[in-house]
Amino acid sequence: MPELPEVEVTRQGITPYLVDQTVVDLIVRNPSLRWPVPELAKQIIGQTIRQVRRRAKYLLIDTDAGTSIVHLGMSGSLRILPHDTPVEKHDHIDLVLANGRILRFNDPRRFGAWLWCQLPEEAHPLLEKLGPEPLTDAFNVNQLAASLAGKKKAIKLCLMDNHIVVGVGNIYANEALFAAGIHPEAEAGKIDIERLTVLVAEVKQILAHAIKQGGTTLKDFTNADGKPGYFAQKLHVYGRGGETCTQCGNLLSEIRLGQRTTVFCSICQPR
């Protein structure tokens, strides 16, 4: 599943091709995504795209009339292509631009979404209760400590809770907890401020580095130019259950936590 770095890399890739461009057509081949695609054509055709933003794992394509909210789901991607590029299987939506290019939404598993809202989009039900962005000052040790106070849930589940902090999915939660030396099943409310300080710093560093590397490519993600990300080459624990720890040589443990695969080192991340 594309996580925050992959969505941010996509945003950076498509923005130069979209901003200040007029939408001349919208082609919806399959409206049956995670939620039905609304009747977008009458709202967006003729509109000029003002900016492309990201909130959590949502891409926000702004026009004067409103905002398209795009979510890549489990396997979705957005590509900038020439307008005459042949349509392939799972190419569900084309946003056709006056510059002769299209923004094409491909989603094999159809868990993605393309929605529309009038401004202010912050009041949209998908966005209004989201926590702080991890790469901003709003995500800090004081905020995290307050959010975790009294919680008995495993820290990994809290780290992946979008009400606490957005965009930290399974890949980066595994990696950040390993880097901070925190066991993924540790009771969130009992982690001391010193370790939370380290965890906040590691979340920020790992996400920023993943963005710089173009995201993590496992089996689904490519960026807006169709190129893979390279952060997968630097993963220390995610997807490496049963292999040796890069720090101590111990065999990495793999468990299921919150229905997600969780990998950790029992030596470097003591309970």
From Swiss-Prot:
Molecular function per GO: 8-oxo-7,8-dihydroguanine DNA N-glycosylase activity; class I DNA-(apurinic or apyrimidinic site) endonuclease activity; damaged DNA binding; DNA-(apurinic or apyrimidinic site) endonuclease activity; zinc ion binding
UniProt zinc finger (FPG-type) residues: 236-270
EC assignment: 3.2.2.23, 4.2.99.18
Keywords from the named record: DNA damage, DNA repair, DNA-binding, Glycosidase, Hydrolase, Lyase, Metal-binding, Multifunctional enzyme, Zinc, Zinc-finger
Binding site for DNA: 90, 109, 151
Cofactor binding remark: Binds 1 zinc ion per subunit.
Cofactor(s), names only, from the UniProt record: Zn(2+)
UniProt subunit comment: Monomer.
Protein name as annotated: Formamidopyrimidine-DNA glycosylase
Source organism (scientific name): Shewanella oneidensis (strain ATCC 700550 / JCM 31522 / CIP 106686 / LMG 19005 / NCIMB 14063 / MR-1)
Gene that this polypeptide is encoded by: mutM
